[in-house]
């Protein structure tokens, strides 16, 4: 009995920090976003709601809508992000100029025709004509707009998952959509194509506030400048949302 008890004691031992093997060394912002979807919200990434009443529209418009339906979710978000990454602000005064820019992206193989088809030029025009878009345009024309900035930042594992040991550190990597300088301070901008209804802006804030805090912290460390404002721009709502 004593031998059996000793064997059970030795081989039945459970390592108290077994969960640590599940803690990754590095995670991406996309991984954290997926985790937030499962835990915190039912927000689904897509650009447009289907209308409650189906209007009578010309066939060519209906065909475009069908193409948009087929090209949904993250792929559509990627298309919008590509336009904003490559947007030439000195050629944004008209719808025609914006259309020519998108055509040029297709011609240069920076965007597929399917991606271009799902872009509503009016969405880009609304952004550029808005207050935030005008500030970004001014920064771009002065060489003070920066886009697609990669970063890596360290966070405690417990901040990512409460089940993980807070003493462990995890590297979070991602890409900042855009930021620009006003004086000696930074304005941070993140584009979203998530499907939300007007009046539900807080859903975006709840889902992405930690992500933008990581971005702001990374920028402050990289540049030594203070991030004075953090914005989410929703293409669905055609609205900028200032985070506190």
Identify the role of each PLM range.
Residues 1-244:
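Structural signature of nuclease core domains in nucleic-acid processing machines
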């Amino acid at each position: 009995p004593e031998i059996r008890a000793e064997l059970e004691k030795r081989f039945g031992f459970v390592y108290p920090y077994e969960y640590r093997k599940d803690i990754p060394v590095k995670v991406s912002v996309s991984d954290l976003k997926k985790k937030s979807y499962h835990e915190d919200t039912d927000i689904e990434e897509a650009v447009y709601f289907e209308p409650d009443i189906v209007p009578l529209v010309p066939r060519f418009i209906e065909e475009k809508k069908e193409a948009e339906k087929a090209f949904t979710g993250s792929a559509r978000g990627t298309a919008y992000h590509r336009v904003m990454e490559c947007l030439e602000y000195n050629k944004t005064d008209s719808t025609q100029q914006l259309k020519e820019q998108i055509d040029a992206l297709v011609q240069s193989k920076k965007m597929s025709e399917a991606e271009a088809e799902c872009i509503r030029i009016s969405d880009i025009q609304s952004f550029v004509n808005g207050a935030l878009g005008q500030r970004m345009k001014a920064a771009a024309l002065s060489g003070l707009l920066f886009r697609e900035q990669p970063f890596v930042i360290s966070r405690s594992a417990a901040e990512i998952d409460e089940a993980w040991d807070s003493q462990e550190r995890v590297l979070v990597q991602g890409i900042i959509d855009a930021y620009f300088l006003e004086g000696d301070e930074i304005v941070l901008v993140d584009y979203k194509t998530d499907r939300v209804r007007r009046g539900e802006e807080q859903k975006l804030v709840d889902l992405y506030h930690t992500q933008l805090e990581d971005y702001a912290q990374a920028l402050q460390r990289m540049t030594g400048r203070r991030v004075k404002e953090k914005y989410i721009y929703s293409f669905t709502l055609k609205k900028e949302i200032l985070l506190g």
